[in-house]
């Protein structure tokens, strides 16, 4: 998408972003680009007052990377996320497809939004408890302190207005992130989701 700054004849556009997703997450550097004036001055002052700026060495590293390697790095990052999205969508379709009502996402950002067919996903559901390893069954949860690996997702109930029209369907939805974890672990997590669906069917919850 072309930046609005390129056609901002009135000086009204400010672009805000982060370098964490395209350069290196550990840098923890955000940026704001726009016309000089009271707003930009206030943001700079507030950042300085709060002491929230990244260390100067990190800023210098980021500046160098932007000047010398940004285009190539952005292309690599975009290609990497594109491949991750394709792989994750393939596993979702192959492992969970028979139980899916809808799957959205994967074209921008780092999330897929899934709607399951008759499977509750809220915090008290069998699906959630299986993946959180809180079923109370050692063969599923593991034995403390060696609990089996867990899968963390955002239940759909937290993505809809509590008094809105989507409350009911939100009980069968969840958001799955693919931005951070490596692909082999994501594939394994989706297989555990398949197992969680089977558990939910047999446990009635």
Each model region followed by its residue ranges:
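PLP-dependent class I/II
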Residues: 1-205
